[in-house]
Amino acid sequence: MKHEETYTSTLHTHVHFFIYEPQVIIRVKAVLFVQHDLNENASNYDHFANFMCDKGYVVVVSDMVGHGHSLIDFEQGYFGKTDVLDHLMKDMHHLQKVMMARYTDTPYYYIGTGLGAQMIREYAARFGDYFQGMLLMGAVSGVRAYRYKNLCLNFFKLMKGERYHLNKLALRNRMKLSHHFNGDYPFSYLTDNEQLVNRFSNDTLTNFSYTVKGYSDIYKISRHANSEETYQKTPTYLSTWI
């Protein structure tokens, strides 16, 4: 059974999330949190969540701020004015506490892809005692040419403002990924299924670009998630699959 709920983010917007609960089961195997990647939203994981739900898991899929319907001032690809990492971590922990109040004595796991995997890395360093394991897919090892990219973003911020959408950068990044798989379209890197590629291309909740501030936050999150400090703070007993 699927239902949608919201909570108030520390970034002062409403975060939407879906809960998938087995209808007929004696005991829930675990609660599984899904953290989506860039240019995604909670609805993209409906098929996977239903599959896991049928296997006896409770699945929680949440929009990240700036994605889906969890927007600040209706702005896609924008996380907020402040240094957002601490706020995003508090949001993740708040959602876990909501579920822990409902499912006590139940294992908790996280699964994430891309930026979602980086978020889980960071979360594990801060709240690793609160869950049993994590599965990280497509977690990049860092940010290449970070200083140069940050310099370019500061230039755009000065000239256009922090909410300016970098459409050309988004298109270039997607085409670069697609060319690795001999794809001809921006979303060809996702799958060779043309119907799914067209769906992503025509969906305004996935086919959007990030703001200058959004890209800056993404780079900072990825860099910090791969820092020595984060690795040292992550519990060694936490089950991790990469």
Features from the language model and the residues they span:
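N-terminal cap/lid segment of alpha/beta-hydrolase-fold proteins
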Residues: M1-V24
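Conserved alpha/beta-hydrolase
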Residues: N44-E75
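Serine-hydrolase catalytic core
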Residues: L177-I242
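Alpha/beta-hydrolase fold nucleophile elbow
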Residues: Y103-G114
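Active-site glycine-rich loops that stabilize anionic/oxyanionic intermediates
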Residues: H36-E40, G114
